[in-house]
């Protein structure tokens, strides 16, 4: 047990030396990115041992405590919770980050601040691991805020771009709204349970009030970009592609879902919270899938697919299946990171072109990238025996057998079908037909720092689901029988989406849309939500504030009440009691006229 705990803690502490090295020796050499990459690779190897020991010994939870500080009413300690969720997530996050770091060596090679970029990515990963292993709300809040501030720094990495700065501010502001809910839950639990440790909170109050649970749901809504607080996620594509890959695969966006998974014992008996969670996830996964259908930016298509999959995870929590939601987090990390890296490879080779309408024919010039992009897209749609199939098929199957409402189930099924539709559209426009980019574009796919990480994640997208599904705890009692049509539901709607998208592409790829329909505008403009929230409401607020200021301050206060009114009354009284009118100009003129006439007569 001691050896197991020591190796698990060693995994976490192994990431600290590269961070502190930059403080001790600011004059870093060019080898620092390679040092960070090798550190993460070795840490991944180390993390496999405690994970395998945990799975083989059938441990449930191991908690390590170190006393930190104490107040009159609360004792705080550094508490690490090593359970199935944390032990499974750590090696997956390290493996994905290792691949992203190696990809960054190729993608960011010309950036003058590449060392700082690698340090930021490493801190980003470290704060996420702190969040995953935290056993009290205060420690979890440190990791929560850590991933928030690091996302702000990394999204706005190219700070000379106005769009990048705007996207970074959007991310931090929307997450501030979610943090209000987190702090509200912190305060409520401290007031009513006098503890921030989940075990004690569950024992003392197994069915808490609606208020803290709503706070946790609001926090997850902001961090995992659920409907209402979602616009920051597609805007975050203004950051470098490695940032997008890490942000969407195994760090920030899954933090909100992980929070709901961690505190699921508190929410599972509250029917109102479960219903709100289910409906929020269902409408998010459908809305973002609709938005992805008409996007032309390849990174935004992948970003909206992330938001749609996050909605599916929230739906899974809403039907009381946290282990299935966690399984989808693990499988999703592999193919989502690979999709972003394939997108980055295409963008980099096409001189920063991101419009899929200006691509085409890339399966000949970028064979590995094209193959990996196709595998990742198929895994995203849940094609059989790819990584995404093992989690997505189980989620649809469980939703069919659960006591959920028909609206949420239908919405989720439609979104699943749309996932295959926009994935097919992206593949057809990007990889097939003739090239629609300048023929003199220099395309090169021979760099090993590009090929190796994509190959690793491709293998993960093929095999990881099979390996993870065999180690997940039972999610429900074994079913003796299940109707065939329920078993084939996920596959049927996926194939329906494929066929529909392929048929529409063949029918319309030669047509020009002179007058786009209202439906197209709704999807392409993201439901007009950003325009409404970022333009209409601020403009109305500023106009109202300006009118109130001018009417209340200028007209009412200055004109009608105090300064001008007092001045007017004093002038009237002065004129009444004094014969001198104070007309200095007239007096001077009356003095000058006789003087002028006298001078004229003399002359």
Curated annotation (Swiss-Prot):
UniProt-listed Enzyme Commission number(s): 7.1.1.2
GO BP annotation list: electron transport coupled proton transport; mitochondrial electron transport, NADH to ubiquinone; mitochondrial respiratory chain complex I assembly
Catalyses which reaction(s): a ubiquinone + NADH + 5 H(+)(in) = a ubiquinol + NAD(+) + 4 H(+)(out)
TM helices/strands, residue ranges: 4-24, 36-56, 87-107, 114-134, 137-157, 171-191, 200-220, 241-261, 272-292, 301-320, 325-347, 366-386, 407-429, 457-477, 482-502, 583-603
Superkingdom of origin organism: Eukaryota
Stretches assigned to coiled coil: none
Single GO MF annotation: NADH dehydrogenase (ubiquinone) activity
Pfam short name (any one): Proton_antipo_M
UniProtKB keywords: Electron transport, Membrane, Mitochondrion, Mitochondrion inner membrane, NAD, Respiratory chain, Translocase, Transmembrane, Transmembrane helix, Transport, Ubiquinone
Chief localization: mitochondrion
UniProt topology in membrane: Multi-pass membrane protein
Keyword presence, Chaperone: no
GO CC entries: mitochondrial inner membrane
Compartment annotation: Mitochondrion inner membrane
Subunit structure: Core subunit of respiratory chain NADH dehydrogenase (Complex I) which is composed of 45 different subunits.
Family recorded in the similarity comment: Belongs to the complex I subunit 5 family.
Function noted in UniProt: Core subunit of the mitochondrial membrane respiratory chain NADH dehydrogenase (Complex I) which catalyzes electron transfer from NADH through the respiratory chain, using ubiquinone as an electron acceptor. Essential for the catalytic activity and assembly of complex I.
Protein name as annotated: NADH-ubiquinone oxidoreductase chain 5
Source species: Hylobates lar (Lar gibbon)
